[in-house]
Amino acid sequence: MSTRREVILSWLREKRQTWRLCYLLGEAGSGKTWLAQQLQKDKHRRVITLSLVVSWQGKAAWIVTDDNAAEQGCRDSAWTRDEMAGQLLHALHRTDSRCPLIIIENAHLNHRRILDDLQRAISLIPDGQFLLIGRPDRKVERDFKKQGIELVSTGRLTEHELKASILEGQNIDQ
């Protein structure tokens, strides 16, 4: 029998051609990062990961990593108070501009600013897919849902519910 992570990964792979924006949410240790890593490995394509980090001083900074840099264990320095689209543009100049998968980690932090920047970021990569990863938060989920971002939970759905929705081809909505 498949594990919960494998079932969710199967759903994401199956639906990959249909979603443009997806919010993968779950508590710490629920497998969100593992799922994102598996999607990166699927096609061995370039992936850009943006991680929003909030320091103890309350300042937000983006850390931008492409797939090669992540494999080497190095990270670019963070820029404080810069917009997501600007960091994405910087990353695109360093990597393949046809990057198909953009992962935005910690999307629950400062989510309204992410939503503001997302349209500009999408215009930079018109054929890309954006996978937002974060913790469950009703306000964040509601705001993302209003923007048409598909929600996928790693923790609240039972394996049976997820398998049933895969078999029926239904959209998972929480």
Where is each model-derived feature located?
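Sensor-1/coupling segment of RecA-like P-loop NTPase cores
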Residues: L109-N110, A121-K145
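Conserved P-loop NTPase "ATPase switch" module shared by AAA+ and STAND
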Residues: A91-I114
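Walker A/P-loop nucleotide-binding motif
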Residues: W19-A36
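Conserved small helical "lid"/interfacial subdomain of P-loop NTPases
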Residues: S153-Q174
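Conserved catalytic segments around the Walker B and adjacent sensor/switch elements
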Residues: K41-W56, A61-W62
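N-terminal pre-P-loop "Q-motif" helix
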Residues: M1-L12
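Phosphate-binding P-loop
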Residues: R13-W19
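Conserved NTP-binding/hydrolysis module of P-loop NTPases
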Residues: S55-H93
